[in-house]
Protein backbone atom coordinates (compact mmCIF):
# COMPACT_ATOMS: atom_id res chain seq x y z
CA UNK A 1 0.00 0.00 0.00
CA UNK A 2 1.27 3.48 -0.90
CA UNK A 3 2.00 5.42 2.29
CA UNK A 4 -0.39 8.16 1.12
CA UNK A 5 -3.20 5.60 0.84
CA UNK A 6 -2.44 4.41 4.36
CA UNK A 7 -2.55 7.94 5.74
CA UNK A 8 -5.86 8.55 3.98
CA UNK A 9 -7.64 5.53 5.47
CA UNK A 10 -6.28 6.55 8.85
CA UNK A 11 -7.87 9.98 8.34
CA UNK A 12 -4.49 11.63 8.86
CA UNK A 13 -4.33 13.99 5.87
CA UNK A 14 -5.86 17.47 5.89
CA UNK A 15 -4.11 19.25 3.01
CA UNK A 16 -1.42 18.42 0.45
CA UNK A 17 0.32 20.82 -1.89
CA UNK A 18 0.58 18.29 -4.73
CA UNK A 19 -1.05 14.94 -3.96
CA UNK A 20 -0.41 13.39 -7.37
CA UNK A 21 3.22 14.48 -7.41
CA UNK A 22 3.91 13.29 -3.86
CA UNK A 23 2.16 9.98 -4.40
CA UNK A 24 4.33 9.30 -7.46
CA UNK A 25 7.50 10.52 -5.71
CA UNK A 26 7.14 8.20 -2.70
CA UNK A 27 6.34 5.23 -4.96
CA UNK A 28 9.45 5.72 -7.08
CA UNK A 29 12.01 6.98 -4.57
CA UNK A 30 13.14 6.81 -0.98
CA UNK A 31 12.59 10.36 0.24
CA UNK A 32 13.75 12.40 3.20
CA UNK A 33 11.04 14.32 5.03
CA UNK A 34 10.90 16.41 8.16
CA UNK A 35 8.77 17.68 10.98
CA UNK A 36 9.84 20.25 13.53
CA UNK A 37 9.15 21.12 17.13
CA UNK A 38 10.18 24.22 19.02
CA UNK A 39 11.62 23.72 22.53
CA UNK A 40 9.06 25.92 24.29
CA UNK A 41 8.98 23.41 27.17
CA UNK A 42 11.03 20.54 28.55
CA UNK A 43 8.56 17.86 27.47
CA UNK A 44 6.32 17.01 24.57
CA UNK A 45 2.67 16.26 25.30
CA UNK A 46 0.56 13.76 23.39
CA UNK A 47 -0.72 16.45 21.03
CA UNK A 48 2.86 16.86 19.78
CA UNK A 49 2.93 13.17 18.93
CA UNK A 50 0.44 13.48 16.07
CA UNK A 51 2.77 14.76 13.30
CA UNK A 52 5.66 12.65 14.57
CA UNK A 53 3.50 9.52 14.27
CA UNK A 54 3.08 10.39 10.59
CA UNK A 55 6.84 10.81 10.29
CA UNK A 56 7.33 7.38 11.88
CA UNK A 57 4.85 5.81 9.44
CA UNK A 58 6.94 7.16 6.57
CA UNK A 59 10.00 5.58 8.18
CA UNK A 60 8.19 2.25 8.47
CA UNK A 61 7.45 2.56 4.74
CA UNK A 62 11.18 2.88 3.99
CA UNK A 63 11.68 6.66 3.96
CA UNK A 64 14.16 8.74 5.98
CA UNK A 65 12.71 11.02 8.68
CA UNK A 66 14.46 14.17 9.84
CA UNK A 67 13.45 15.43 13.28
CA UNK A 68 14.08 19.14 13.63
CA UNK A 69 14.34 20.63 17.11
CA UNK A 70 14.06 24.39 16.80
CA UNK A 71 16.86 25.79 18.89
CA UNK A 72 16.67 28.95 16.74
CA UNK A 73 12.94 29.30 16.03
CA UNK A 74 12.28 28.45 19.67
CA UNK A 75 13.92 31.71 20.70
CA UNK A 76 11.15 33.57 18.87
CA UNK A 77 8.03 31.45 19.15
CA UNK A 78 5.57 30.39 16.47
CA UNK A 79 2.51 32.70 16.41
CA UNK A 80 0.37 29.91 14.90
CA UNK A 81 -2.72 29.30 17.00
CA UNK A 82 -1.74 31.95 19.54
CA UNK A 83 -3.92 34.97 20.38
CA UNK A 84 -1.13 36.94 22.02
CA UNK A 85 2.63 37.34 21.93
CA UNK A 86 4.67 34.50 23.42
CA UNK A 87 6.97 35.19 26.34
CA UNK A 88 10.58 34.78 25.27
CA UNK A 89 12.74 32.26 27.12
CA UNK A 90 16.43 32.51 27.95
CA UNK A 91 18.93 30.77 25.69
CA UNK A 92 19.99 28.65 28.65
CA UNK A 93 16.44 27.38 29.19
CA UNK A 94 15.97 26.71 25.48
CA UNK A 95 19.20 24.67 25.40
CA UNK A 96 17.97 22.55 28.33
CA UNK A 97 14.62 22.05 26.61
CA UNK A 98 16.35 21.01 23.38
CA UNK A 99 18.23 18.24 25.17
CA UNK A 100 15.08 17.01 26.94
CA UNK A 101 13.19 16.83 23.64
CA UNK A 102 16.09 15.01 21.99
CA UNK A 103 15.79 12.24 24.59
CA UNK A 104 12.02 11.89 24.13
CA UNK A 105 12.13 11.95 20.34
CA UNK A 106 15.01 9.50 20.35
CA UNK A 107 12.68 6.83 21.74
CA UNK A 108 10.17 7.20 18.91
CA UNK A 109 12.39 6.66 15.87
CA UNK A 110 14.90 4.12 14.60
CA UNK A 111 18.32 5.71 14.07
CA UNK A 112 19.95 2.73 12.35
CA UNK A 113 19.50 0.97 9.02
CA UNK A 114 18.68 2.07 5.48
CA UNK A 115 15.87 4.39 6.59
CA UNK A 116 17.67 5.71 9.67
CA UNK A 117 16.25 8.84 11.22
CA UNK A 118 18.39 11.90 11.88
CA UNK A 119 17.94 14.73 14.35
CA UNK A 120 18.94 18.32 13.59
CA UNK A 121 18.85 21.69 15.35
CA UNK A 122 18.12 24.77 13.24
CA UNK A 123 20.30 26.86 15.55
CA UNK A 124 23.31 25.21 13.85
CA UNK A 125 22.66 26.87 10.48
CA UNK A 126 20.92 30.03 11.73
CA UNK A 127 23.29 31.29 14.43
CA UNK A 128 25.85 32.73 11.99
CA UNK A 129 23.36 34.49 9.67
CA UNK A 130 23.84 38.23 10.19
CA UNK A 131 20.92 40.66 10.08
CA UNK A 132 22.19 41.98 6.73
CA UNK A 133 22.47 38.45 5.31
CA UNK A 134 18.97 37.71 6.58
CA UNK A 135 17.47 40.78 4.90
CA UNK A 136 19.44 40.46 1.62
CA UNK A 137 19.37 36.70 1.11
CA UNK A 138 15.95 35.84 2.54
CA UNK A 139 13.88 38.92 3.38
CA UNK A 140 14.14 40.02 -0.25
CA UNK A 141 12.31 36.83 -1.32
CA UNK A 142 9.19 37.50 0.78
CA UNK A 143 6.33 39.75 -0.25
CA UNK A 144 4.82 41.51 2.78
CA UNK A 145 1.33 41.46 1.27
CA UNK A 146 1.56 37.68 0.89
CA UNK A 147 2.85 37.30 4.44
CA UNK A 148 -0.01 39.43 5.78
CA UNK A 149 -2.57 37.23 4.03
CA UNK A 150 -1.41 34.07 5.82
CA UNK A 151 -3.95 32.92 8.40
CA UNK A 152 -1.33 32.78 11.15
CA UNK A 153 -0.62 36.50 10.69
CA UNK A 154 -4.07 37.74 9.62
CA UNK A 155 -5.65 36.33 12.77
CA UNK A 156 -3.32 38.47 14.89
CA UNK A 157 -3.52 41.80 13.06
CA UNK A 158 -6.33 43.21 15.21
CA UNK A 159 -4.58 42.54 18.52
CA UNK A 160 -1.13 43.18 17.10
CA UNK A 161 1.91 41.09 16.23
CA UNK A 162 5.58 41.96 16.70
CA UNK A 163 8.05 41.90 13.83
CA UNK A 164 9.76 39.05 15.69
CA UNK A 165 6.76 36.74 15.40
CA UNK A 166 5.84 38.15 11.98
CA UNK A 167 9.25 36.99 10.72
CA UNK A 168 8.83 33.48 12.14
CA UNK A 169 7.54 32.11 8.82
CA UNK A 170 10.74 33.31 7.14
CA UNK A 171 12.89 31.35 9.60
CA UNK A 172 10.79 28.21 9.14
CA UNK A 173 11.03 28.64 5.37
CA UNK A 174 14.80 28.91 5.74
CA UNK A 175 14.76 25.57 7.55
CA UNK A 176 12.94 23.80 4.72
CA UNK A 177 15.24 25.37 2.13
CA UNK A 178 18.35 24.36 4.12
CA UNK A 179 17.16 20.77 4.55
CA UNK A 180 16.24 20.59 0.85
CA UNK A 181 19.69 21.79 -0.19
CA UNK A 182 21.87 19.87 2.27
CA UNK A 183 19.73 16.85 3.26
CA UNK A 184 17.74 16.31 0.05
CA UNK A 185 14.57 16.78 2.12
CA UNK A 186 11.48 16.85 -0.10
CA UNK A 187 8.51 16.90 2.27
CA UNK A 188 7.50 18.89 5.35
CA UNK A 189 4.78 17.60 7.67
CA UNK A 190 2.89 19.69 10.20
CA UNK A 191 -0.40 20.37 11.91
CA UNK A 192 -3.22 22.12 10.06
CA UNK A 193 -2.10 25.45 11.54
CA UNK A 194 1.28 25.09 9.80
CA UNK A 195 -0.03 25.36 6.23
CA UNK A 196 1.06 28.99 5.84
CA UNK A 197 4.56 28.28 7.15
CA UNK A 198 4.94 25.20 4.95
CA UNK A 199 3.84 26.97 1.75
CA UNK A 200 6.21 29.84 2.59
CA UNK A 201 9.01 27.27 2.65
CA UNK A 202 7.97 25.82 -0.69
CA UNK A 203 7.93 29.30 -2.24
CA UNK A 204 11.44 29.97 -0.93
CA UNK A 205 12.74 26.64 -2.25
CA UNK A 206 11.45 27.44 -5.75
CA UNK A 207 13.10 30.87 -5.65
CA UNK A 208 16.41 29.58 -4.30
CA UNK A 209 16.64 26.15 -5.96
CA UNK A 210 14.79 26.81 -9.22
CA UNK A 211 11.19 26.57 -10.40
CA UNK A 212 11.56 22.84 -11.13
CA UNK A 213 12.57 22.00 -7.55
CA UNK A 214 10.40 19.13 -6.29
CA UNK A 215 9.20 19.68 -2.74
CA UNK A 216 5.90 19.01 -1.02
CA UNK A 217 3.86 19.88 2.05
CA UNK A 218 1.34 17.80 3.98
CA UNK A 219 -0.76 18.82 6.97
CA UNK A 220 -2.76 16.80 9.49
CA UNK A 221 -6.32 17.53 10.65
CA UNK A 222 -6.91 19.14 14.04
CA UNK A 223 -7.76 16.27 16.36
CA UNK A 224 -10.76 16.91 18.60
CA UNK A 225 -12.70 14.69 20.97
CA UNK A 226 -16.30 13.65 20.41
CA UNK A 227 -17.45 16.08 23.09
CA UNK A 228 -15.86 18.95 21.17
CA UNK A 229 -12.98 19.55 23.59
CA UNK A 230 -9.33 19.68 22.57
CA UNK A 231 -7.46 16.40 22.35
CA UNK A 232 -4.50 15.87 24.65
CA UNK A 233 -5.84 17.27 27.89
CA UNK A 234 -7.31 15.55 30.93
CA UNK A 235 -8.98 17.09 33.96
CA UNK A 236 -5.52 17.36 35.50
CA UNK A 237 -4.02 19.17 32.49
CA UNK A 238 -1.76 18.07 29.64
CA UNK A 239 -0.65 14.45 29.24
CA UNK A 240 3.13 14.63 28.98
CA UNK A 241 5.60 12.17 27.49
CA UNK A 242 8.08 12.86 30.28
CA UNK A 243 7.43 10.14 32.93
CA UNK A 244 8.33 12.58 35.69
CA UNK A 245 5.46 14.87 34.62
CA UNK A 246 2.92 12.20 33.68
CA UNK A 247 3.68 8.77 35.11
CA UNK A 248 3.34 5.72 32.82
CA UNK A 249 0.35 4.67 34.94
CA UNK A 250 -1.37 8.05 34.41
CA UNK A 251 -0.46 7.86 30.73
CA UNK A 252 -2.02 4.39 30.48
CA UNK A 253 -5.14 5.56 32.33
CA UNK A 254 -5.62 8.48 29.93
CA UNK A 255 -5.91 6.10 26.99
CA UNK A 256 -7.95 3.46 28.82
CA UNK A 257 -10.56 6.13 29.60
CA UNK A 258 -11.04 7.04 25.94
CA UNK A 259 -14.66 7.58 24.91
CA UNK A 260 -16.17 4.83 22.72
CA UNK A 261 -16.86 7.53 20.12
CA UNK A 262 -13.15 8.41 19.87
CA UNK A 263 -11.30 5.14 20.35
CA UNK A 264 -11.35 3.89 16.74
CA UNK A 265 -10.10 7.26 15.49
CA UNK A 266 -7.27 7.16 18.03
CA UNK A 267 -6.35 3.60 17.06
CA UNK A 268 -5.95 4.79 13.47
CA UNK A 269 -3.95 7.88 14.43
CA UNK A 270 -1.68 6.52 17.11
CA UNK A 271 -1.10 2.79 16.64
CA UNK A 272 0.54 0.69 13.97
CA UNK A 273 -2.26 -1.87 13.94
CA UNK A 274 -3.46 -2.93 10.50
CA UNK A 275 -6.77 -1.90 8.97
CA UNK A 276 -8.16 -5.40 9.56
CA UNK A 277 -7.12 -5.36 13.23
CA UNK A 278 -8.70 -1.96 13.81
CA UNK A 279 -11.89 -3.00 11.98
CA UNK A 280 -12.19 -5.98 14.32
CA UNK A 281 -11.78 -3.78 17.39
CA UNK A 282 -14.33 -1.34 15.93
CA UNK A 283 -16.87 -4.18 15.73
CA UNK A 284 -16.22 -5.01 19.38
CA UNK A 285 -16.88 -1.39 20.33
CA UNK A 286 -20.32 -1.78 18.73
CA UNK A 287 -21.19 -5.25 20.01
CA UNK A 288 -19.34 -5.54 23.34
CA UNK A 289 -18.50 -2.01 24.51
CA UNK A 290 -18.44 -3.08 28.17
CA UNK A 291 -15.31 -5.20 27.54
CA UNK A 292 -13.41 -2.08 26.39
CA UNK A 293 -11.15 -4.20 24.21
CA UNK A 294 -10.33 -1.27 21.92
CA UNK A 295 -9.39 0.99 24.83
CA UNK A 296 -7.21 -1.70 26.42
CA UNK A 297 -5.42 -2.25 23.12
CA UNK A 298 -4.94 1.49 22.56
CA UNK A 299 -3.60 2.03 26.09
CA UNK A 300 -1.22 -0.91 25.83
CA UNK A 301 0.13 0.05 22.40
CA UNK A 302 0.69 3.68 23.36
CA UNK A 303 2.32 2.96 26.72
CA UNK A 304 4.74 0.50 25.09
CA UNK A 305 5.52 2.90 22.25
CA UNK A 306 6.18 6.00 24.36
CA UNK A 307 7.61 4.34 27.47
CA UNK A 308 8.43 0.61 27.38
CA UNK A 309 7.09 -2.91 27.81
CA UNK A 310 8.21 -2.76 31.44
CA UNK A 311 6.29 0.49 32.00
CA UNK A 312 3.18 -1.13 30.54
CA UNK A 313 3.53 -4.11 32.87
CA UNK A 314 3.84 -1.71 35.82
CA UNK A 315 0.74 0.22 34.73
CA UNK A 316 -1.25 -3.01 34.40
CA UNK A 317 -0.05 -4.20 37.80
CA UNK A 318 -1.06 -0.92 39.46
CA UNK A 319 -4.46 -0.94 37.73
CA UNK A 320 -5.15 -4.49 38.84
CA UNK A 321 -4.08 -3.74 42.43
CA UNK A 322 -6.31 -0.67 42.67
CA UNK A 323 -9.28 -2.52 41.18
CA UNK A 324 -8.93 -5.52 43.50
CA UNK A 325 -7.70 -3.63 46.56
CA UNK A 326 -4.74 -6.01 46.84
CA UNK A 327 -2.04 -3.34 47.01
CA UNK A 328 0.51 -5.09 49.21
CA UNK A 329 2.51 -6.47 46.27
CA UNK A 330 3.17 -3.02 44.80
CA UNK A 331 6.70 -1.61 44.91
CA UNK A 332 7.44 1.86 46.26
CA UNK A 333 7.88 3.16 42.70
CA UNK A 334 4.53 1.70 41.66
CA UNK A 335 2.87 3.22 44.72
CA UNK A 336 4.25 6.65 43.83
CA UNK A 337 2.76 6.28 40.35
CA UNK A 338 -0.62 4.84 41.31
CA UNK A 339 -1.28 7.03 44.34
CA UNK A 340 0.10 10.31 43.01
CA UNK A 341 -3.23 12.12 43.31
CA UNK A 342 -4.61 10.70 46.57
CA UNK A 343 -4.46 12.62 49.88
CA UNK A 344 -0.97 12.21 51.33
CA UNK A 345 0.17 12.38 54.94
CA UNK A 346 3.53 12.22 56.71
CA UNK A 347 3.70 10.20 59.95
CA UNK A 348 6.25 10.09 62.75
CA UNK A 349 8.66 7.17 62.57
CA UNK A 350 7.28 5.66 65.79
CA UNK A 351 4.80 3.00 66.86
CA UNK A 352 1.22 4.12 67.56
CA UNK A 353 -2.24 2.77 68.25
CA UNK A 354 -4.20 2.48 64.97
CA UNK A 355 -7.12 4.63 66.17
CA UNK A 356 -4.82 7.36 67.49
CA UNK A 357 -2.68 7.15 64.36
CA UNK A 358 -5.66 7.70 62.04
CA UNK A 359 -6.84 10.73 64.03
CA UNK A 360 -3.38 12.27 64.45
CA UNK A 361 -2.77 12.13 60.70
CA UNK A 362 -6.19 13.59 59.90
CA UNK A 363 -7.49 10.55 58.04
CA UNK A 364 -10.29 10.33 60.61
CA UNK A 365 -11.93 13.45 62.12
CA UNK A 366 -12.32 12.03 65.65
CA UNK A 367 -11.54 9.02 67.82
CA UNK A 368 -15.22 8.14 67.90
CA UNK A 369 -15.41 8.01 64.09
CA UNK A 370 -12.10 6.14 63.91
CA UNK A 371 -13.24 3.47 66.38
CA UNK A 372 -16.53 3.10 64.53
CA UNK A 373 -14.84 2.68 61.14
CA UNK A 374 -12.30 0.17 62.49
CA UNK A 375 -14.95 -1.82 64.35
CA UNK A 376 -17.17 -1.92 61.25
CA UNK A 377 -14.30 -3.18 59.05
CA UNK A 378 -14.15 -0.01 56.95
CA UNK A 379 -10.39 0.54 57.45
CA UNK A 380 -7.79 -1.32 55.37
CA UNK A 381 -4.03 -1.13 55.84
CA UNK A 382 -2.09 -2.15 52.72
CA UNK A 383 -5.18 -3.95 51.45
CA UNK A 384 -5.91 -5.88 54.64
CA UNK A 385 -9.03 -5.17 56.71
CA UNK A 386 -8.35 -4.00 60.26
CA UNK A 387 -10.94 -4.53 63.03
CA UNK A 388 -8.66 -4.68 66.08
CA UNK A 389 -9.09 -1.45 68.08
CA UNK A 390 -5.88 -2.25 69.96
CA UNK A 391 -3.71 -2.73 66.83
CA UNK A 392 -0.29 -1.07 67.01
CA UNK A 393 1.05 0.47 63.79
CA UNK A 394 4.74 -0.38 63.41
CA UNK A 395 7.42 -0.97 60.76
CA UNK A 396 5.72 -4.18 59.59
CA UNK A 397 2.88 -2.02 58.23
CA UNK A 398 5.16 -0.23 55.78
CA UNK A 399 5.85 -1.21 52.18
CA UNK A 400 9.62 -1.10 51.52
CA UNK A 401 9.78 0.84 54.80
CA UNK A 402 8.49 3.91 52.92
CA UNK A 403 4.71 3.84 52.54
CA UNK A 404 1.50 2.69 54.18
CA UNK A 405 -1.63 2.61 52.04
CA UNK A 406 -4.85 3.29 53.95
CA UNK A 407 -8.26 2.62 52.47
CA UNK A 408 -11.51 3.75 54.03
CA UNK A 409 -14.57 2.05 52.62
CA UNK A 410 -14.47 0.75 49.06
CA UNK A 411 -12.51 3.42 47.21
CA UNK A 412 -11.22 6.21 49.45
CA UNK A 413 -7.42 5.90 49.53
CA UNK A 414 -4.79 7.73 51.57
CA UNK A 415 -1.01 7.46 51.28
CA UNK A 416 1.21 7.75 54.34
CA UNK A 417 4.97 8.27 54.18
CA UNK A 418 7.37 8.62 57.12
CA UNK A 419 9.73 11.27 58.47
Curated annotation (Swiss-Prot):
Motif ('KMSKS' region): 230-234
Annotated positions binding ATP: 233
Cellular location(s): Cytoplasm
Motif ('HIGH' region): 39-48
An example Gene Ontology molecular-function term: tyrosine-tRNA ligase activity
A GO biological-process term: tyrosyl-tRNA aminoacylation
SUPFAM superfamilies with a match to the protein in the record: Alpha-L RNA-binding motif, Nucleotidylyl transferase
Assembly notes: Homodimer.
HAMAP family in the cross-refs: Tyr_tRNA_synth_type1 (MF_02006)
Function as written in the Swiss-Prot or TrEMBL entry: Catalyzes the attachment of tyrosine to tRNA(Tyr) in a two-step reaction: tyrosine is first activated by ATP to form Tyr-AMP and then transferred to the acceptor end of tRNA(Tyr).
Descriptive protein name: Tyrosine--tRNA ligase
Organism field: Listeria monocytogenes serotype 4b (strain F2365)
Amino acid sequence: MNIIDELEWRGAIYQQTDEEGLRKWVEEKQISLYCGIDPSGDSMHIGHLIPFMILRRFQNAGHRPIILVGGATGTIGDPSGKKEERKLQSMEQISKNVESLRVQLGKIFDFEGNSAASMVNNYDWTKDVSILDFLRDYGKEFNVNTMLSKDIVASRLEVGISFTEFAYQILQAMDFNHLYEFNDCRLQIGGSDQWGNITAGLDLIRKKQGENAKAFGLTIPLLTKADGTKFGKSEGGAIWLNPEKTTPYEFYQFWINTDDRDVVKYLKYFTFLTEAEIDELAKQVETEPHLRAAQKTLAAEMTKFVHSEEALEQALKISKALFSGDVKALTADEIEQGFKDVPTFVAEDTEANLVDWLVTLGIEPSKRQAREDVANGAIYINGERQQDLEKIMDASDRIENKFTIVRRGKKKYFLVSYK
